[in-house]
UniProtKB/Swiss-Prot annotation:
This is Adenine-specific methyltransferase PglX. One of its GO terms (molecular function) is nucleic acid binding. InterPro entries: BREX_1_PglX (IPR047939), DNA_methylase_N6_adenine_CS (IPR002052), MethylTrfase_TaqI-like_dom (IPR011639), N4_N6_ade-DNA_methylase (IPR050953), SAM-dependent_MTases_sf (IPR029063). Disruption phenotype: No visible phenotype during normal growth, BREX no longer confers phage resistance. Pfam families: Eco57I. SUPFAM superfamilies: S-adenosyl-L-methionine-dependent methyltransferases.
Length: 1179
């Protein structure tokens, strides 16, 4: 099946149909903004200069009434999909030769012929379709093929409506009026339907109907989710588009065979039947007492006609269609005749509900087509199927209710029937509906129908309500108040955040355990729909298996039912959904408790797509047999089926971490832009690194404090990057917003921490005293340093992680999950290994502090490991050896700690102590990275952030003291130009060369510059100095922005793409005169140098120099002219800003301060729009 072609057709058909239906409405004087009054005549009416017949006026009135009842857009959408459904249904029937006339309506059997066969065969089928031959002949004589086709199409739909009334309602209303024109033209929906989808894809594959529907609504679905991101809740009209997801066929087969199939085989074992169901899972070997329980539960009296199967969210009927196939097998082996089976299945076995009218139509049609595939005579009389789209009772007047009740009915029951279905499309099949006296109500319906035949005036007034609406309510109430042997579905996935208030309140009131998501609500509803001893099968989101918010639902199902089987699918099950968005599981439950039942769980999460998962299932890979009631011993009742027996024992026999310690989640500011800064952004004298408590912090009168915000995966030490504003003013504000400062008694305490969200393993590290923790940086204190270290060692082990993975196998390590890790006594065993733990911490700290983005940075590794060497290449080798040794030592330490914990927990058969290299968090030497960081350190020394005469951070606010820079002078004016040639003696390249000379030596200068250039990927035609200049000109600032997480501290003045002018300024040394100084001392100087260089090229061009020299001079002149022009234009920008004398406040952070110099509006004269320009390079 070519799903790309199917999707392309469906998506384009929706837009074409909507546009065409809108055009037809326009011709009738109806648009979204107005409804015109028609000019009426005796035999018709005219509007927009077009004449219509009198009966069309009544149709137009019904259309207007519908628009007023709903709205214009919804009615246009409904008419469009009605015709879409009819077109695809007729196409399916004609290709499979199911049309009663045997003549194709939309296409021709003759290859290459565009005109449908029905046009040429019209007189032969006139009687079958009740065609008026006078109309046919007139249209033929007038050569109106399009009109003839529309006439035949409408008659064909009406005729099909006699055998499939739910799919083809009689066309005599506004849908006929809005039937699009030009249906046979090139590019029309009908022509595209025939040409774009291969005929083979229609043959005996009724699932194509479901795919067409899903793709048809895909754009609408995208619109709904785009609105959801804008906090627009999902309305009842949009619930179908938001929640429809077509289930892969093999998963449907698993669900049906292991619920419906199992129901039959448990009491009627049959090897032949079982062999036909290749997704049926044979029962695992059970203990004798379990087998005894199972024997007692068998229902040997069950006959095929007794079985009832419900899909409460049937969509386009995919699951019910396969249930039909399985039921057919059951009937066959029970000895029924093949001719009678399809009708029995439709009328006795299958039930379906949905809130989407169009999907329900297609489900009905799919079942009829499935029945037709088994019995060619199935269309000989209308069948009443037990499927329906849930209808609302809104708007039924009291007079109609009174009339319906009459003298014979219980008014309370009819009132209940009406009331329970008010706004029912809001809730769908989750509505709790009671059984009432349907026999008496249906008897009254017959009386009213007989009165209708004698034209009772009162009943005529409410004929639509009495003869159409109330029967629909009765039908759906009967289905929804019954219980079934098998209930199976792919429920809608909709989190409570997307629900509107009405739906959210209903879910909270009636399905509290599952209120977080509609799929969980449907799990509970399916359970309610099921008979005792019956089966429930769903495919839904795996989150219910693990997340703490579904703890109650897990406990409920583990206590009240038996998991018969499960395929844990993970992501990639639905081929049309990419990434990790939908992570699924499919399962079968028995609504009866069978203690110690051994359940097969199949783990398919590691396979990438649905096809791979299917093959693994069939090859019987990744199977785990577990008694699911053991999960009741797991804290939180997680479905930890892939835990080994010893792991499950550890859960059941030990205390959990939360029994002994109290891990906490920290604060959420509610406004990070206001309260959080990266530590390098602010004035260092306004940071308090050592507060002991909240009162101590406030007494210091200092604003900024270290803040633990989680961060990427890292163990032992690190991720110290943020500060939080926590003075008294900020504290008072934070106490009232965000999450209102939870666990504040623990702020500034030492302990351990981990990131709540990560892309890897759990990484636990030190939480330094003086730090406040965030909701993303969870916190735990054991009360003393020794126990903190022990806990950190355990939580960083693969033992702790394997337990945590069973508790919650997502990338979120919530406090509640960590609380549930089983904790054995191991402190005494670790006493002798304390040196291993402290070694891990010190190695990780040394690594973290070797990079200038750490507030513990002292000196660059190229200088720390210099010893007496004067060659950078040798120093890099020393550093590389040291980093490798540290890496290997940390790896050995972690593996030894793993070995200890594996032994403590007796998991030698389940785990090995090895740690993958990718999971060791410290960095090995990297020539390019380390040389670039050496260059960054050099720039820091040039601008005064660092000094060769003093360790650590020397200046980041306060008074600048030039006496701290003796060995290598910091730039006096805080401005370092970056140019593409040596225009300034103190440009950045000259200063860097001087830095290399000072830190290493004059003798090895050229060798060291060559080594640096090599690390920067020097080009073949470059000198080392040219390579270094190119790096500063093109890449240094990009690397700086990346290193400082888009919060650069060295700001780049940048004239534009021609590199006319660039200069670096250190943010912490900026003052109101800096911009003016850049302009007068550097930009203007450079402009004069460009002018001089251009003049020099002019002299050469007028001389008798060689052609080669002149060509080069001309090229250089053109470049210089572009740079000069760019500088002149930039001068306007810099002059405008210099005059403003902008001040910055470091407390505001880089983002706010940088923006003051961007998007500057330059006046362009009266009546002209100001020109926007940037002073600084974009970040």
């Amino acid at each position: 099946m070519n799903k790309t072609a199917i999707k392309n057709f469906a998506v384009s058909a929706r837009m074409k149909l909507i546009d065409a239906v809108k055009q037809k409405a326009y011709e009738l004087g109806i648009t979204e903004t107005e409804i015109k009054e028609p000019e009426t005549y005796e035999d018709g009416f005219r509007i927009n200069n077009k004449f219509f017949r009198s009966y069309e006026l009544e149709q137009r009135k019904k259309l207007i009434q519908k628009i007023e009842e709903k709205d214009y857009k919804q009615v246009i959408e409904e008419v469009s999909y009605t015709w879409f459904n009819r077109f695809i249904a007729i196409r399916f029937m004609e290709v499979n030769e199911y049309l009663p006339t045997g003549v194709r309506v939309l296409s021709s059997t003759q290859e290459g012929k565009n005109e449908p066969d029905v046009i040429g065969e019209v007189t032969n089928i006139a009687e079958d379709l009740d065609l008026n031959l006078d109309i046919v002949y007139r249209l033929q004589d007038e050569n109106k093929t399009e009109d003839l086709f529309k006439y035949i199409l409408i008659k064909q739909c009406n005729k099909l409506g006699e055998i499939m009334p739910m799919m083809f309602e009689t066309i005599q209303d506004y849908t006929e009026l809005l039937l699009p024109d030009n249906l046979l033209g090139e590019g029309s929906v009908v022509r595209n339907l025939v040409s774009m989808i291969d005929e083979e894809d229609w043959k005996e594959q009724v699932e194509i109907i479901g795919w067409l529907y899903q793709y048809y609504i895909s754009e609408k679905k995208d619109e709904v989710f785009a609105d959801l991101k804008k906090n627009k809740k999902i309305t009842k009209e949009n619930i179908p588009a938001a929640t429809q997801l077509f289930t892969p066929k093999w998963i449907v087969k698993y669900m049906v065979e292991n619920s419906l199939g199992r129901l039959w085989l448990e009491s009627h074992p049959n090897e032949d039947v079982q062999q036909q169901w290749k997704y049926y899972l044979e029962e695992a070997e059970q203990e004798p007492n379990v087998q005894e329980q199972l024997e007692k539960l068998k229902n040997n009296e069950l006959s095929p006609e007794d079985i009832t199967v419900l899909d409460p969210c049937m969509g386009s009927g995919h699951i019910l269609v396969y249930a039909f196939d399985v039921l057919y097998n059951i009937y066959q082996h029970a000895g029924y005749s093949e001719r009678e089976i399809p009708q029995l299945i439709l009328e006795k076995n299958l039930y379906g509900l949905d809130i989407d009218d169009r999907a329900a139509q297609l489900a009905y049609f799919a079942l009829m087509m499935k029945a037709r595939s088994y019995n060619r005579r199935i269309f000989r009389r209308p069948l009443e199927l037990n499927v329906c789209s849930i209808q609302e009772s809104n708007g039924i007047p009291q007079e109609a209710i009174d009339y319906f009740v009459g003298d014979s009915l219980d008014r309370d029951e009819i009132t209940y029937l009406i009331r329970v279905f008010e706004d029912s499309k809001e809730y769908g099949s989750i509505l709790e509906v009671l059984s009432i006296d349907f026999v008496s109500i249906e008897k009254r319906m017959i009386e009213i129908q007989e009165m209708q035949e004698v034209k009772d005036i009162f009943s005529l007034q409410y004929s639509d309500i009495l003869l159409i609406k109330i029967p629909q309510l009765i039908k759906q109430a009967k289905i929804m108040s019954s219980k079934y042997h098998v209930v199976l579905t792919n429920p809608p996935y909709m989190g409570s955040k997307g629900m509107n208030e009405q739906l959210k309140k209903y879910c909270t009131k009636f399905f509290k355990k599952g209120k977080r998501d509609l799929f969980a609500v449907l799990m509970l509803k399916c359970f309610n729909f099921t008979k005792e001893g019956g089966y429930i099968s769903n495919i839904n989101q795996q989150s219910w298996m693990f997340l703490s918010s579904y703890e109650e639902i897990r406990k409920y199902f583990l206590s009240e039912s038996t998991i018969c089987s499960m395929i844990h699918l993970g992501s990639g099950s639905f081929e049309e959904i990419n990434g990790e968005v939908v992570q699924s599981t499919s399962f079968v439950l028995k609504k009866q408790v069978v203690k110690n039942y051994q359940t097969p769980f199949i783990r398919l999460v590691e396979y990438n797509d649905s096809q791979e998962k299917k093959l693994s299932f069939l090859e019987k890979k990744e199977r785990y047999i577990v008694a699911a009631d053991l999960f009741l011993n797991v804290p939180g009742y997680q479905i930890a089926y892939w835990a080994t027996q010893k792991m499950l024992v550890a859960f059941s026999e030990n205390k959990v971490l939360g029994d002994l310690y109290d891990p906490r989640q920290g604060l959420a500011t509610g406004d990070n832009d206001r309260f959080l800064r990266l530590w390098h952004e602010v004035d260092k004298v306004r940071i308090n690194w050592g507060a002991l408590s909240i009162s101590d912090a406030h007494e210091s009168k200092i604003k900024w404090f270290p803040h633990n915000k989680g961060g990427r995966f890292r163990k032992w030490y690190g991720n110290n990057e943020y500060l939080i504003s926590f003075n008294i003013e900020s504290y008072n504000t934070l106490a009232k917003q965000g999450n209102c400062l939870p666990s504040k008694q623990l702020y500034f305490k030492s302990g351990i921490t981990w990131s709540r969200t990560t892309s890897n393993l759990l990484g636990v590290r030190l939480h330094n005293q003086g730090t406040i923790f965030d909701c993303e940086g969870c916190f735990l204190s054991a009360g003393n340093t020794r126990d903190d270290y022990y806990l950190m060692a355990f939580l960083n082990s693969n033992v702790a992680f394997v337990f945590l993975e069973k508790i919650n196998p997502t990338l979120h390590f919530q406090v509640g999950d960590v609380r549930k890790i089983p904790l054995m006594t191991f402190n005494n065993l670790l006493e002798a290994k304390m040196d291993l733990i402290t070694s891990c911490i010190s190695i990780s700290k040394r690594d973290w502090d070797s990079f200038e983005t750490s507030w513990g940075f002292i000196r660059h590794p190229m200088l720390t490991h210099k010893n007496s060497s004067r060659r950078l290449s040798e120093v890099l080798d020393y550093w590389s050896v040291f980093a490798e040794q540290q890496f290997n030592q940390l790896k050995a330490n972690e593996e030894e700690l793993n070995r200890i914990f594996i032994e403590i927990y007796d998991l030698q058969d389940d785990l090995t102590p090895e740690v993958k290299e990718k999971d060791i968090v410290i960095r090995k030497a990297d020539k390019e990275r380390d040389i670039k960081s050496f260059i960054s350190y050099a720039v820091g020394c040039m601008l005064g952030r660092y000094s060769l005469d003093q360790e650590g951070l020397v200046f980041a606010g306060g008074e600048f003291d030039e006496s701290k820079y003796k060995t290598f002078k910091a730039d006096t004016d805080n401005i370092i130009p970056i140019t593409d040639d040596e225009y300034f003696e103190d440009d950045i390249v000259s200063r860097f060369i001087e830095f290399v000379r000072v830190t290493f030596s004059e003798e090895t200068l050229e060798e060291n510059l060559d080594f640096i250039a090599e690390a920067l990927n020097k080009k073949a035609n470059e000198t080392s100095r040219q390579c270094i200049r190119r790096y500063f000109l093109k890449d240094f600032f990009k690397d700086h922005v990346k290193m400082y997480q888009k919060r650069p501290i060295y700001w780049l003045f940048d004239s534009g793409k021609n590199d006319g002018f660039k200069a670096l300024v250190y943010m912490h040394r900026y003052d109101v005169g800096t911009v003016a100084e850049v302009r007068t001392d550097y930009l203007h100087t450079l402009q004069r140098k460009y002018e001089a260089e251009i003049a020099r090229r002019d002299v050469l061009l007028e001389s008798d120099a060689s052609t080669k020299d002149k060509t080069r001079a001309k090229k250089e002149k053109e470049k210089l002219q572009k740079q000069l022009l760019e500088c002149q234009q930039y001068d306007q920008v810099i002059a405008h800003i210099a005059n403003q004398k902008i001040t910055i406040d470091l407390d505001d952070g880089v983002k706010v301060n940088y923006a003051k110099f961007q998007n500057v509006e330059l006046p362009q004269g009266e009546g002209k729009k100001p020109l926007k320009a940037n002073l600084l390079a974009k970040i």
